[in-house]
Every structure is written in C-alpha cells, then in structure tokens.
Amino acid sequence: RCREIAVCARRADGYGELIDSVFSRYGVPMFRSAMEDILEKPVLALVTSALAAAGSDYPCDELFRYLKTGLTGISDEERDLLENYALTWDLKGSAWTRKKPWDMHPEGYGREFTEADAALVAWLDALRRRVIAPLEALRKNKDKTGRGRALALYQLLDDIDLPTRLAQRADSLDRRGERTAAAQY
C-alpha cells in the first residue's frame, strides 16, 4: 500500500526531481518534505540584499548577493567583471553612486591604459549606473512610513522587471522537467 511507504534520504539534493518523476510515472501519490533556508530563495535573497545594500551604503557583499540572485537583469559575465573591478579597487559607498565616471585601470595601480582598457572601464561604469539606479531610488525614498517603504521596494522590483524574470525562470525550469523548482517561481 502506498500509505505505508517512506523514502528517507539524508541529503535530498539531486534525488527530489528523480523521486517526483518516478512516483508520478507510476501513479504513486506522494508528499515530499525537506528543510530549506527560506532566505536562500532567489526572490527573498534579492529583497533582503537590496534592502541591506541600499540601507548600508552598498557594501560589496550585499550588493553582489543582490546581483548573484540572477534576477536583476545583468548576466553572470557582466556581474563577474563588475565584481572583479569592485574587488580590485575595494569600492564602497559613494564610489558606486558618484556622478563622475569611473577612471581607475581595471587591473589595478601602475598600469598603462590601452584603448581596450578605457572601453572596458566606460562599459563597467555604464553597468554600475544601471545596477545602482533602482537601488538608489530605494535608498533615497523620502517616505519613511511602512507604506512608503513598501511602495519604494515595489518600485525597485518593478524597475528590474522581476515578474517577467520570474516567469522566464519558471518556464526554463519547467522545460527542463524541474517542476518542483519551477513551482517556486
């Protein structure tokens, strides 16, 4: 009888989708439960890191936790180049929000600028502005009421087009057969 079956695994990583697929194929009803850290879910990680980054003058760890959710509209390659530049120059606070364009060599002190280096820095500066703009709008929100802060956060999520990104990710996961993961989006 199905009600007398239990499948236990110390680590369900990698087994969950397989178990779902096999049980579904043979028509065996099932319930699967696993402990998960809710703050590691991409949407919550995005929200908490955006609030922390904007509220703490853009520390690199929070800013890049926000970008590493994959929900901000920049590619992994773009994010990695931006992170390398930020770590090379130990960028903090006003370095992210300054009006003056970035002009530090992408490889550090004492290097001669080539045309390629200048183009890369200009591109990184444009990327920085694109990344920071929605966070700055959140940070500069004047309405400190709960409603005002919620609306500012909602605006950030709208500015980065979160609903579309979530739908795309869910569709991608569903096409790969990862229905449980897709349902979380």
Predicted segments with their positions:
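Polyanion-engaging groove/track-forming segments
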Residues: 1-185
